[in-house]
Amino acid sequence: MNEHTSNPIIEMSGVSKWFGDFQVLKEVDLQVFSGERVVVCGPSGSGKSTLIRCLNRLEEHQEGRIVVDGIELDQDTQHINKVRSEVGMVFQQFNLFPHLTVLENCTLGPMKVRGLSKKDAEALAMEYLQRVRIPEQAAKYPGSLSGGQQQRVAIARSLCMQPRIMLFDEPTSALDPEMIKEVLDVMIDLAESGMTMICVTHEMGFARTVAHQMVFMDEGRIIESSPPAQFFSEPEHERTQLFLSQILSH
């Protein structure tokens, strides 16, 4: 994906953010085009999670511009709500409602926000639960599911809002090792469907498989951005080389 005839679906220009006196993002520039999959990696505290949380205004940037699907994220509440309706997000923790069944977790948003009838919302939810390979869990409560199953419910719940963009913030980091593959397999299926995705992850095998663009962050800056073949075989920056040597040796 080196040539693009359309405008980017996500554009960050000179984005900076502080937590108090600590600058967590430093003049970040990033473009993502429709259908692209971008993997963001880097050491702990490099600003990865803050970067993607700014894309649906879970965090507010102080300088620069963020435009998502043609809408600038500014102080306008209508703009923020419109972007949030286009952007799904999956976190480290599953954030499912424990008192609702799997099906109810998935239908709540479409009914409350998108105005779907219960019948239509349930049909949509079952379609996505099938897609993440757990339709048989629909009547169960989250507490009875494994971590991998709960994370797949969280992915299905986001997809039920029919977003144009999906953000993943280290979705496998809270899982037991044997459950990681089942979640990554679902994410690979989603990538192959053409969904625009930005994933913060250290799952480098997944990154090699699905990413169009690798982004490496350190100390609040994007240090390197390149296609996976180049990123893994010929990283330009010494800091990237050190990071990869450490993470790929495990």
Residue ranges and their predicted role:
Residues 2-4, 240:
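Pre-NBD coupling/linker segments of ABC/ABC-like ATPases
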Residues 225, 229-250:
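C-terminal boundary and immediately downstream tail of ABC-type ATPase nucleotide-binding domains
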Residues 7-228:
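ABC family nucleotide-binding domain
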